[in-house]
């Protein structure tokens, strides 16, 4: 262990980011308060075991505490809470911390169990027409992923993972936050989608945050809000909305629909359901494609696809009600089928231990067996 220079500041800052007291850290880790106070003012360093315990508690790589390298998204969370601190409750701050931890884990797992071939995608912006950037980037990504002009992909999460983005859905207390993008120093581009939104809105948010990852990659942190604050004045937000709209509802596709210039509420409902987008998103796309006049969309936007008719691409339709409920609960904590499968594959191939598997799945070892059962997986030591 090094001499603890800077380690105390890291501990104190993490504690402040997560709004926990020294007493709370002590109660959770078993490290006496007096010792923690000494570590924070750098009177002496923690032991090696204590560093591991603290790294586990704060959901970060223990090497971050003992080296000067940027191994944790520390500066990014510092920016996040300095700019938007009042928007994030204590619970939501822990949710963000766990999300960033899952991104680190997924990046590691993809290096040892590369189950998804990564597609190299770079988009170079030219000129200052922001809306044009969004449209061109959406068309470019669709081409790169091999979509025909008249084809639409239904699993936006899978598409985004193919280009190396870490996409996790997580329920946040603040329902006004639709999503956020973080540039992680080791995991790369990370997208969080608020699971408290409806299924269609989550798809749009995922594509919107992906646009920030692709087009605003000079930014360390971007938070998007449901109330659309600053959207009218913020060209980057307009660009991200354009990207999301044209990725999920490509102009080339809607122009190929029979009688593409004739729309009523029933037809909007039918195609919004087929394309898994809101009626509002579809009508915006129709206007942008020049198929419907903007002043004729008022009644079309108000149509609502019933929530029970909305399909989630990451929830198989053949699940029993009990299994579906359990999977939804896990999804709301960030545990997608893709990520869970990745974790278990690494475990089955001997890349990680059962203890590390539990840690990566945000459960203790006693809950691991139950989670394995929910996903039809096996634990070797349970045999």
Predicted segments with their positions:
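Active-site hotspot residues in diverse enzymes, especially metal/ion-binding acidic/histidine motifs
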Residues: 1-383
């Amino acid at each position: 262990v090094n001499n603890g220079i800077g380690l105390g500041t890291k501990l104190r800052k993490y504690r402040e980011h997560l709004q926990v007291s020294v007493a709370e850290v002590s109660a959770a880790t078993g490290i006496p308060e007096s010792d923690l106070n000494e570590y924070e003012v750098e009177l002496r360093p923690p032991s090696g075991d204590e560093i591991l315990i603290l790294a586990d508690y704060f959901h970060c790589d223990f090497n971050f505490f003992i080296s000067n390298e940027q191994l944790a998204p520390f500066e990014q969370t510092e920016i996040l809470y300095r700019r938007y601190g009042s928007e994030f409750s204590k619970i939501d701050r822990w949710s963000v911390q766990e999300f960033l931890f899952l991104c680190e884990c997924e990046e590691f797992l993809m290096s040892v169990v590369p189950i998804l071939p990564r597609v190299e995608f770079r988009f170079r912006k030219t000129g200052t027409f922001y809306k044009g950037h969004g449209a061109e980037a959406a068309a470019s990504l669709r081409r790169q992923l091999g979509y025909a002009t008249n084809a639409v992909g239904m699993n936006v999460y899978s598409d985004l993972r193919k280009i190396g983005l870490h996409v996790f859905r997580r329920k946040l207390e603040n329902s006004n936050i639709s999503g956020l993008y973080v540039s992680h120093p080791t995991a790369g581009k990370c997208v969080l989608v608020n699971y408290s939104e409806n299924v269609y809105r989550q798809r749009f948010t995922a594509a919107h945050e992906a646009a920030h990852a692709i087009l605003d990659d000079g930014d360390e942190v971007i938070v998007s809000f449901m109330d659309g604050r600053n959207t009218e004045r913020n060209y980057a937000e307009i660009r991200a909305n354009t990207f999301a709209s044209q990725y999920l509802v490509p102009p080339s596709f809607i122009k190929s629909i029979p009688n593409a210039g004739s729309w009523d509420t029933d037809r909007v409902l039918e195609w919004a359901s087929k394309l898994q987008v809101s009626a509002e998103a579809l009508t915006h796309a129709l206007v942008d494609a020049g198929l419907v006049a903007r002043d004729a969309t008022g009644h079309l936007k108000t149509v609502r696809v019933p929530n029970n008719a909305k399909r989630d691409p990451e929830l198989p339709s053949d699940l029993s009600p009990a299994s579906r409920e359990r999977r939804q609960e896990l999804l709301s904590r960030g545990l997608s089928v893709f990520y869970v499968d990745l974790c278990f594959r690494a475990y089955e191939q001997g890349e990680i231990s059962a203890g590390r598997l539990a840690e990566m799945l945000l459960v203790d070892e006693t809950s691991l067996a139950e989670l394995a059962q929910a996903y039809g997986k096996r634990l070797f030591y349970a045999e």
